């Protein structure tokens, strides 16, 4: 009986560790996508500003 309890504790521990790793990877991936979108939006604004200034001159 004790061997079953011990192995089930190991299985639960490893499962929780794997779940935590997946959550961490998903969160970092979402943050990288948000940063990339923000950077692209800034480049778009900068380019539009440069073009509009060129048209005014």
Swiss-Prot record:
Protein name, as recorded: Protein CgkB
Organism: Pseudoalteromonas carrageenovora
Gene name for this UniProt entry: cgkB
């Amino acid at each position: 009986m004790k061997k079953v309890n011990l192995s089930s504790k190991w299985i639960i521990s490893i499962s929780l560790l794997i779940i935590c790793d997946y959550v961490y990877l998903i969160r970092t991936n979402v943050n990288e996508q948000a940063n990339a979108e923000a950077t692209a939006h800034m480049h778009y604004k900068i380019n539009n500003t440069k073009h509009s200034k060129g048209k005014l001159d």
